[in-house]
Structures are given as structure tokens and as C-alpha cells.
Regions:
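A short, Lys/Arg-enriched amphipathic alpha-helix followed by its capping loop at the start of a domain
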Residues: 1-6
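A structural signal for short, well-ordered beta-strand segments and their strand-loop junctions
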Residues: 9-12, 86-87, 116, 181-186
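Carboxylate/His-rich catalytic cores and anion/metal-binding grooves
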Residues: 10-19, 110-118
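Glycine-rich active-site loop/strand segments that organize a redox cofactor
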Residues: 13-69, 185-205
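Flexible, glycine-rich phosphate/dinucleotide-binding loops
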Residues: 17, 93, 123-124, 165, ...
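Hydrophobic/aromatic-lined pockets within catalytic cores
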Residues: 26, 78, 119, 173-177, ...
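Feature captures the FAD/FMN-dependent oxidoreductase FAD-binding
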Residues: 50-124
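Glycine-rich dinucleotide-binding loop and its adjacent helix/turn
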Residues: 56, 62, 69, 118-178, ...
Length: 205
């Protein structure tokens, strides 16, 4: 807002700000220190230690904290400016056409500049079908469904070598599941870099 005097319309298929974090599993956390994220005008997090993480590393926000931050940015900074409108639950159809996902109602808006950020959006299990076939009778769920289980299973198979797969294994172990009851299918061996080398100091931007 400080870099332009333009009026801005934010169009988002999701009902709230925060991108894919709106759909993230409840025990997700940022990869890196919180202070490395957010918008320029509103600081996010601080330089305090991670309270339940590796000693010596900075705090990493939870999914709930991330959603709360973007909600705060929208309602306490963007909307009060009078220059920003947020249209959640809306599809952009092209040529200025908007359609509300729930009602199907359409409208047309006029604009000078279109900024398309959808090419940056990644695919997450919570909103995408599995990229593999699932055998009849097998139960395949996104990671967030684990917290809704009503009874134990004989075993759990985690597919994927990334952070989501690692979070799944760690959560299951912390929930008391035996390591022998967890199968971890990795299409490749992940390269893991120590986070000690990516801890910003207060004097850095």
C-alpha cells in the first residue's frame, strides 16, 4: 500500500486469506523462522527461541498462527485503508469476470493491471487427489485427517519424502504409534540442510 496509490481487489478461491495455509493440516509449521515470512509492512514473529524445537533455533509459526497473521493483515491493515477489497470464495474466469463459488452468481469488474499469482500456487494433498492409483478397499486420506481418527489402525503407510511426509511420521510417533506399524514410502532420498545456517539476525532485512 505504501508503494502505490492504486485501489486493489484481492480475488481468492478460498474463503479467507492465507493461501494454502487455509487448508493445511493442523500440526503443520513453517519450514524456517517466522521472521522470514509475511508481508513487508507488518512484521511476523520475532527473534525468540523456538519453545519446543531444537535449542538455538528461532521460532516457527504454526498453521493457526499463520492464518491468524494473514487475517490480521487483512482486517487491521488492508481493509481499513479503504483501498483494498477482499473477494473470498470467488473464481476469476478471465476478462474481468468473477463467479462466486457457492452461489454461481457472476459479475464483471474493470481494472488497469492484472496480477496473476496462481502460477505460484503449489499442489497439496488436502485439496488434490492422490497422484497414484488406490486399490479397492484401501483407505487413502490427506494428512489432516489423522487428527480425526476415532480408532487405531493396524498400520500406517506414509507416502512422500518431503516435509509433509516427515511431519506425518513424527506425528504418528508422538501419538504413540509404534515405529514397526509405520511404513514410509519415499520415491527418493531427501536432501536435508541444517537450519542452523539459515537463522536471520535482528539487523538483517
Amino acid at each position: 500500500l505504501s508503494r502505490t496509490d492504486a485501489d486493489i481487489v484481492l480475488v481468492d478461491r478460498r474463503h479467507a486469506p492465507g493461501g494454502h495455509w487455509v487448508d493445511a493440516y493442523p500440526f503443520a509449521r513453517l519450514h524456517m523462522p517466522t521472521v522470514m515470512y509475511g508481508v513487508d509492512s507488518v512484521p511476523f514473529g520475532g527473534y525468540g527461541p523456538d519453545p519446543d524445537g531444537t535449542p538455538g533455533l528461532l521460532e516457527r509459526a504454526t498453521a493457526a498462527e499463520i492464518r491468524g497473521y494473514y487475517d490480521q493483515v487483512l482486517h487491521q491493515t488492508f481493509l481499513p485503508s479503504g483501498r483494498v477489497r477482499f473477494l473470498g470464495g470467488v473464481d476469476y474466469l478471465g476478462d474481468g469476470r468473477l463467479r462466486r463459488i457457492v452461489s454461481g452468481k457472476e459479475r464483471i469488474i474493470r481494472f488497469k493491471t492484472l496480477v496473476d499469482t496462481t502460477y505460484l500456487e503449489g499442489s497439496i494433498p488436502a485439496t488434490s487427489p492422490p497422484p497414484f492409483d488406490v486399490a479397492p478397499g484401501a483407505r487413502c486420506v490427506p494428512l489432516g485427517e489423522l487428527v480425526h481418527l476415532k480408532e487405531p489402525n493396524d498400520g500406517y503407510t506414509v507416502i512422500g519424502a518431503g516435509k509433509t511426509g516427515q511431519d506425518a511420521c513424527i506425528w504418528l510417533l508422538n501419538a504413540g504409534v509404534s515405529a514397526d506399524a509405520i511404513q514410509w514410502v519415499r520415491p527418493r532420498e531427501p536432501w536435508l540442510l541444517p537450519r542452523y545456517g539459515a537463522q536471520p539476525g535482528p539487523g538483517l532485512p
